[in-house]
Amino acid sequence: MASLLLEHLENKAAVDEAIRGTKNRVLVLRFGRASDTACLQQDDILARCERELSKMARLCLVEAAQVPIYCQYFDISLIPATIFFVNGQHMKVDYGTPDHTKFIGAFRTKQDFIDLVEVIYRGARHGKSIVNCPIEKSHIPKYDLIYKDI
């Protein structure tokens, strides 16, 4: 199992520490469930990329049920959801979808993930807080946002 090779954050305090403590690298947080097939596919891609991205990214897995406060804050209702931070700042990405705060679904290829992390890393180094997604539009999962209680 690829997820055994990646760092697991077990609670809110661990997630907070990872966000505050990761300096000069992209922090990638994958929110999901270990039993979900899409999460397992995502974990496999993350594990295969970890060595190549070790100088520019820290990859962590977060069990969504263990940190409900972050799931509520980032409005994580579909999994896997991948969120990016650099030096404690939440990085947003224009995926061509209504939500720029997170990537919903699994990445299709290892290269898609590597390209995205590189663009976020370079954008953050130039002071940007939002970057354009380099992933082909056909590789980005489609979904509709449904707003409750408006």
Question: Where are each of the predicted segments found?
Answer:
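Intrinsic disorder/low-complexity signal
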Residues: 1-5, 130-150
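Intrinsically disordered, low-complexity, Ser/Thr/Glu/Asp/Lys/Arg-enriched terminal regions and linkers
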Residues: 3-6, 52, 119-122, 126
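Thiol-based oxidoreductase modules, predominantly thioredoxin-like and allied folds used
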Residues: 6-11, 29-33, 40-43, 47-69, ...
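A short beta-strand-turn-helix
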Residues: 8-26
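Short hydrophobic/charged patches on amphipathic alpha-helices used for structural packing
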Residues: 16, 68-71
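A structural signal for the main folded, soluble domain(s) of proteins
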Residues: 21, 28-31, 37-41, 91-93
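Short amphipathic alpha-helical segments embedded in low-complexity Lys/Glu-rich regions
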Residues: 32-36, 45, 60-67, 96-102, ...
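Non-catalytic, surface beta->alpha helical segment in thiol-disulfide oxidoreductase systems
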Residues: 77-79, 84-138
